[in-house]
Swiss-Prot record:
Any single GO BP term: translation
Classification via InterPro entries: Ribosomal_protein_uL29, Ribosomal_uL29, Ribosomal_uL29_CS, Ribosomal_uL29_sf
Full protein name: Large ribosomal subunit protein uL29
Xref: SUPFAM superfamilies: Ribosomal protein L29 (L29p)
Cross-referenced PROSITE patterns: RIBOSOMAL_L29 (PS00579)
Family: Belongs to the universal ribosomal protein uL29 family.
Gene Ontology molecular function: structural constituent of ribosome
Source superkingdom: Bacteria
Keywords: Ribonucleoprotein, Ribosomal protein
Organism per entry: Neisseria meningitidis serogroup B (strain ATCC BAA-335 / MC58)
């Protein structure tokens, strides 16, 4: 997910994407805790995508 792609989305769509990613992050954290996580890099990718969305939401709120 690129920041440029996110800037084209509406605030409602960004909030929906953020909610989906937070749910995915929770599931990945549970898999990691139980030792079932196959790709640890997936947790890192989701965390960074969440940060990107929050950054774009903050930028849109400041305008």
């Amino acid at each position: 997910m690129k920041a440029n792609e996110l800037k084209d989305k509406s605030v409602e769509q960004l909030n929906a994407d953020l909610l989906d990613l937070l749910k995915a992050q929770f599931g990945l954290r549970m898999q990691n805790a139980t030792g079932q996580l196959g790709k640890p890099s997936e947790l890192k990718r989701v965390r960074r995508d969440i940060a990107r969305i929050k950054t774009v939401l903050t930028e849109k709120g400041a305008k």
